[in-house]
């Protein structure tokens, strides 16, 4: 086995982060990426760290678990966080990016790093020539997936991810929508499409009766709750959308609103939000409207949304299969495999769910691949931190109940002592302790 470089397979969020962390520590990297020579069903470009589902890195507040994780990653010099900050677009209290400019910048930085050799080629075998980080993501090619499944005891776990449609801003009827962020948090960053009760019921009936695209015969429906198709969510009951992506709370009508409304109510019955998708503000995605409907049905049903009657859809919603391994049986909290300490996994295939979580796993895997390379003790971050709690959770939960997991305060080690009833204050205390413990851990 070579002791002159480390392999990273896959240049998505996790692989890009891992490659950067390895090179930053002075170790040469061979970074393999098949896009450029082989397409995937979901990606549109050959850029590294391409965002395929949404352009949002979610909430920024430290009272939000993903906000805490992002802050920890910033303190660990994450290329994904740093580049994301440089390509932010307005999104209220969330962090959203111009997905094209952001991905191009990550690609350029890694391609121009003298310690990183980019190899545009499909990897069909698990490399054994050097320490290796596999970060091929939910769209792992079939040939490599078969080899990974052998490690997985011949089992293949998966669920379905769906992406929301994107519309051309110039085709939105701006007289029917208004600009506002929920509860007026941050700047007014979302275009809101308000619905009366009658409009919502008409839309709901069309949605639950719309025709879905077919699954392959060997596939069955299995969804991750955080990226569930809007039509599947709707079929759980008419109120589901009103407490989910179409909830009107905190999105009251502006004073100059002249459109239809239910009596004297200050807020709509339901709201569809549109979020800016690029820096120029020429594209908007329909927030929370991941879908598996046929494209013709998407056009028909989503054109019922006020303001989108004449909308030009530059991308329809699509769905892909998202594979993940049995991390509780296969991985250590370092992201190395238990049976082969020279083989690491990172990203969504480990069972972490979300852009930020994927990048965080790549950061930890990259650091530990270097530690292995130098024959040093692996780093396991404290369970009191978000970046330590996530790998601990995916490697210690009961295998038969294992499902992909977003970061949340429920998996971070409890504060202990009397429980603080006020949720915001409790989360503030957890975040304060996390950042303090991380700083202490890094100085040691």
UniProtKB/Swiss-Prot annotation:
Assigned EC number: 2.1.1.74
Subcellular location: Cytoplasm
Highest taxon above the source species: Bacteria
One Pfam family in the UniProt entry: GIDA
InterPro entries: FAD/NAD-bd_sf, MnmG-rel, MnmG-rel_CS, MnmG_N, TrmFO
A GO molecular function held by the record: tRNA (uracil(54)-C5)-methyltransferase activity, 5,10-methylenetetrahydrofolate-dependent
UniProt: FAD binding residues: 10-15
Transmembrane segments: none
This protein's UniProt keywords: Cytoplasm, FAD, Flavoprotein, Methyltransferase, NAD, NADP, Transferase, tRNA processing
Alphabetized Gene3D superfamilies for the sequence: FAD/NAD(P)-binding domain
Cofactor(s) annotated in UniProt: FAD
Catalytic reaction list: uridine(54) in tRNA + (6R)-5,10-methylene-5,6,7,8-tetrahydrofolate + NADH + H(+) = 5-methyluridine(54) in tRNA + (6S)-5,6,7,8-tetrahydrofolate + NAD(+); uridine(54) in tRNA + (6R)-5,10-methylene-5,6,7,8-tetrahydrofolate + NADPH + H(+) = 5-methyluridine(54) in tRNA + (6S)-5,6,7,8-tetrahydrofolate + NADP(+)
Function of the molecule: Catalyzes the folate-dependent formation of 5-methyl-uridine at position 54 (M-5-U54) in all tRNAs.
HAMAP family: TrmFO
The name this protein goes by in its record: Methylenetetrahydrofolate--tRNA-(uracil-5-)-methyltransferase TrmFO
């Amino acid at each position: 086995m070579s002791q002159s470089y480390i392999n990273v397979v896959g240049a998505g969020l996790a692989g890009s982060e891992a490659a950067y962390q390895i090179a930053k520590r002075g170790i040469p990297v061979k970074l393999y990426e098949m896009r450029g020579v082989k397409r995937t069903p979901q990606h549109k470009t050959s850029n590294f760290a391409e965002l395929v589902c949404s352009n949002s890195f979610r909430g920024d507040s430290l009272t939000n678990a993903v906000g805490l994780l992002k802050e920890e990653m910033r303190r660990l010099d994450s290329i994904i966080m740093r580049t994301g900050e440089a390509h932010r677009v307005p999104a209220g209290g969330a962090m959203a990016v111009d997905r094209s400019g952001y991905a191009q910048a990550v690609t350029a930085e890694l391609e121009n790093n003298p310690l990183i050799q980019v190899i545009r080629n499909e990897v069909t075998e698990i490399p054994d020539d050097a320490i290796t980080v596999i970060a091929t993501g939910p769209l792992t090619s079939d040939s490599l997936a078969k080899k990974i499944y052998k490690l997985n005891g011949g089992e293949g776990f998966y669920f379905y991810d769906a992406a929301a449609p994107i519309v051309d801003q110039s085709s939105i009827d701006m007289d029917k929508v208004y600009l506002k962020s929920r509860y007026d948090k941050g700047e007014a960053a979302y275009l809101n499409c308000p619905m009366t009760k009658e409009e919502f019921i008409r839309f709901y009936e069309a949605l639950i009766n719309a025709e879905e695209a077919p699954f392959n015969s060997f596939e069955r429906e299995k969804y991750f709750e955080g990226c569930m198709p809007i039509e599947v969510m709707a079929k759980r009951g008419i109120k589901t959308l009103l407490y989910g992506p179409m909830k009107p709370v905190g999105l009251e009508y502006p004073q100059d609103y002249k459109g239809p409304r239910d009596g004297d109510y200050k807020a709509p019955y339901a709201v569809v939000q549109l979020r800016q998708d690029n820096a120029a503000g020429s594209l908007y995605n329909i927030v929370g409207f991941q879908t598996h409907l046929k494209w013709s049905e998407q056009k028909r049903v989503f054109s019922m949304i006020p303001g989108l009657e004449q909308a030009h859809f530059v991308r329809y919603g699509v769905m892909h299969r998202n594979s993940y391994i049995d991390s509780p049986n296969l991985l250590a909290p370092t992201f190395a495999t238990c049976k082969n300490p020279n083989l690491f996994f990172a990203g969504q295939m480990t069972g972490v769910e979300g852009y930020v979580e994927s990048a965080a796993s790549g950061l930890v895997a990259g650091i530990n691949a270097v530690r292995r390379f130098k024959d040093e003790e692996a780093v396991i971050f404290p369970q009191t931190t978000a970046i330590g709690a996530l790998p601990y959770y995916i490697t210690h939960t009961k295998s038969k109940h294992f499902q992909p997991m977003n970061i949340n305060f429920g998996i971070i080690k409890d504060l202990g002592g009397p429980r603080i009833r006020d949720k915001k204050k409790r989360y503030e205390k957890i975040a304060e302790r996390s950042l303090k413990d991380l700083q202490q851990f890094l100085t040691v």
